[in-house]
Amino acid sequence: MIHVPVNANNSDLAIRSLKKKMQRELVFRSMKMSRFYEPPSVKRVRKKQESERRHRKERAMRRRMMEE
């Protein structure tokens, strides 16, 4: 559960920090994905693509670290 303190009735700042926390925890993405039924076959393909993207990103980060 996400907690956001509201100091001195500053609701605008609290809303901004809530949005940032929700984006970091991928709440918006999970809400979007659960809007419609996703068949298991499509879910497997999506998860595999996400995994490949994550691994590609990690490899690129390692290469950059080795070059420096």
Swiss-Prot record:
GO terms for biological process: translation. The keyword Ribosomal protein applies. This is Small ribosomal subunit protein bS21. Transmembrane segments: none annotated. GO terms for molecular function: structural constituent of ribosome. It comes from Orientia tsutsugamushi (strain Boryong) (Rickettsia tsutsugamushi). Belongs to the bacterial ribosomal protein bS21 family. Residues 39-68 are annotated as: Disordered. InterPro entries: Ribosomal_bS21 (IPR001911), Ribosomal_bS21_sf (IPR038380). The lineage of its organism: Bacteria, Pseudomonadati, Pseudomonadota, Alphaproteobacteria, Rickettsiales. Residues 54-68 have a biased composition (Basic residues). It holds the Pfam family Ribosomal_S21. GO terms for cellular component: ribonucleoprotein complex; ribosome. Keywords: Ribonucleoprotein, Ribosomal protein. Disulfide bonds: none annotated.
